[in-house]
Amino acid sequence: MTILNIIEAIDRWGMKEPNRPVYIETNRTYTYGELKQDSDAIAGYLQKNIGRGRPVVVYGELEFEMLACFLGASKAGHAYIPIEAHTPKERVEMILEVAEPAMIFAVKDWPEIETDAEIISIDKLNNICAELETVGSLEPVVGLETYYIIFTSGTTGVPKGVQISHNNLLSFVNWELTDFGITEGMRFLSQAPYSFDLSVMDLYPALTSGGSLTPMAKEVINDFKQLFTLLPTLAIEVWVSTPSFMDICLMEPTFDGEHVDSLKVFLFCGEELPKATAQKLVDRFPQARIFNTYGPTEATVAISGVEVTQALLDEYSRVPIGRVKKDTTVYIMTNDQEVSTGEVGEIVIAGASVSKGYLHNPEKTAAAFFEYNGQPAYRTGDAGKLVDGMLLYDGRIDFQVKLHGYRIELEDIDHHLAGVSYVKQAAVVPKYQNDKVQQLVAFVVANPHDFEKEFKLTKAIKEELSLSVMDYMIPQKFIYVEQLPLTANGKIDRKGLMNEVNAT
């Protein structure tokens, strides 16, 4: 399945099969016909009221109106910026300062934040869609125009707006539709906030292939009793998730192919897929295809992927991050020089996946983006190596610490801890003293055990861990928790854990 234009591919379903379901809520099912009608109306309103090319903000949660605004903005030649409702006020203010949007579609009530942008309330948005004024033909979208802007965290505390073009998105969607078992009309679970680019992995492959999205409300995601009561009734076929969230799901004994028999495809992105998690999924969902993918926001969601099978798990000690998509090249570099095949270095991505850089931030763009072999390239900050065309992840460069002179990859310890029989899930963070790493602290979700005292459990974990890592990699302190904290994007909240251990 190959598409030539994102907007036309989505609109085709609205014209060909207007009654086909596109967005399935608990009490309402929206159709492709409604999506086309509403997005056309929004595009017409934008064309009439603001100059082409200026970004617009779409503020809300997982709602149909968000989709209509995304598509309407794109049709009219505007990049959209998704901001999740309840985002901290200070972060919203910083995004507005950087982005200078012309208009804000407030699908949820807009907070008391001053802005020069015109604010379109949900009531006014509904009126725009209901009136559906006849507009002139829309100017065709150019592939280099920006499709969306997603703001990621910046090292200085100011968010960076990653600009993804129509061409970037088209390349990604065609790859997912071709390589990951997606067929026409599949039903996707919509879980990730639209302000997180993981959502792009379900949103656009679903819409361009005539599929449907079933949004999962936050209150359901955070209430596992409700989630696992509801899940078998939804007939979900494709689930895009972070490994951390899936780890929590796998704690539920009934989360398997027998009780949730509709699932056909799992897609993972956003962080490393632990081998223990992958093994559980292979064992529990023999009927499903499981894919591990890799890529930063700056390279349009993901650029490499591999199907996770028992044979793959038997061959590799760590789940590979896959083979690189055809229109993209990965270089392994140290100090901007390519290393020998099989050596570890920084993963540098070049080609069709690489974004246009950071919005209104030439300094940060110049630091991370450059031209290499005639192609746009991006320094990921991830360590890895290429072996026989397979990309192997070796952790974040900025998750590497030095303790007593040894360079330690924290995610490597996480990986080995997750393989200890007493451990369900773990995250290791450094504790600092006078700007130097004093010790390693492990936060652990433990499996059921017979130890009466925590120190005996810790002793047993250390003994088993010592069989696979060097002594200097064994955490000095263990903190036992019922659940590791997650960010809004579903990743382990390492910053929060670091703040906790370094607050005392």
For each feature predicted by the language model, list its residue ranges:
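AMP-binding/adenylate-forming domain of the ANL superfamily
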Residues: 1-149, 164, 275-278, 326-329, ...
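AMP-dependent adenylate-forming
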Residues: 5-7, 104-139, 169, 289-292, ...
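Conserved AMP-binding A3 loop
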Residues: 31-33, 147-174
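ATP-dependent adenylate-forming carboxylate-activation enzymes
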Residues: 41, 60-64, 78-97, 108-110, ...
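Conserved AMP-binding
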Residues: 60-63, 84, 182, 192-196, ...
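Conserved pre-ATP/AMP-binding loop-to-beta segment of ANL
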Residues: 135-151, 158, 182-188, 194
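Conserved AMP-binding/adenylation subdomain of ANL enzymes
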Residues: 160-189, 197-237
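Gly/Ser/Thr-rich phosphate-binding loop
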Residues: 209-211, 236-240, 250-316
